[in-house]
């Protein structure tokens, strides 16, 4: 739903999204300044506040923040991005993307200790104090590691990692944690799912005991993921 909202918003504003395929096979959004502004409008605005509203209805005292607020997420802006087009590796410059390297844990601890539930979203802040689009899956892995989480759940529009994508009947139920980096398992990730698998690798390296790839389309997706549905890495 949220991806569709962002896509429709970009089309309505006359700036359709463009995706880049990197040499390693990962797919990411090309983020020029206009795209970044649309991203902020949709994710920091509509999506974040909608989630806060839903959580408040369930009795959780949620508070919505972006990585810009209080320098919550800080990282390095990429000066150039490599991508593949028609079999050739090219370089795109002027992108507003980056990787989070610092988390303002003191701010998060302050909120958590006061009884708030933070609802967090990119963008992050660069070291030059510019907004940068960052990978939410990488941020989730970083936070799970930072707080010693028992489990990390990644939700998407498929039931988990599929052996024969897009055949949902080919769901891979479990991956041994020590084998998550094996080529046969890394190869299961298609398109933007590669980012989630990379996040899982990072989380496992950081000591997270269980990572679950699960279906966002079902009722109670988090509860069902934690009960064993989807693809479980442990």
Annotated model-derived regions:
Residues 1-234:
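C-terminal catalytic "cap/lid" subdomain
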């Amino acid at each position: 739903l949220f991806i569709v909202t962002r896509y429709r918003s970009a089309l309505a504003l006359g700036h359709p999204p463009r995706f880049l395929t990197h040499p390693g096979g990962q797919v990411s959004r090309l983020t020029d300044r206009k795209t970044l502004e649309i991203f902020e409008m949709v994710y920091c605005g509509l999506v974040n506040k909608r989630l806060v509203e839903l959580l408040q209805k369930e009795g959780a005292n949620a508070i919505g923040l972006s990585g810009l607020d209080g320098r919550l997420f800080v990282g390095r802006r990429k000066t150039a991005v490599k991508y593949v087009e028609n079999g050739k590796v090219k370089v795109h410059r002027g992108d507003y993307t980056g990787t989070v390297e610092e988390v303002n844990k003191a701010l998060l601890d302050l909120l958590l200790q006061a009884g708030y539930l933070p609802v967090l979203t990119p963008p992050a802040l660069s070291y030059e104090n510019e907004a940068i689009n960052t990978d939410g899956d990488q941020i989730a892995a970083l936070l799970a590691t930072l707080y010693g989480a028992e489990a990390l759940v990644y939700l998407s529009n498929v039931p988990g990692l599929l052996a024969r994508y897009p055949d949902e009947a080919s769901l891979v139920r479990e991956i041994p944690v020590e084998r998550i980096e094996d080529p046969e398992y890394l190869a299961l990730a298609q398109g933007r799912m590669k980012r989630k698998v990379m996040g899982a690798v990072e989380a496992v390296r950081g000591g997270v005991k269980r990572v679950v790839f699960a279906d966002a389309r079902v009722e109670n997706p988090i509860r069902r993921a934690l009960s064993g549905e989807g693809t479980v890495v442990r």
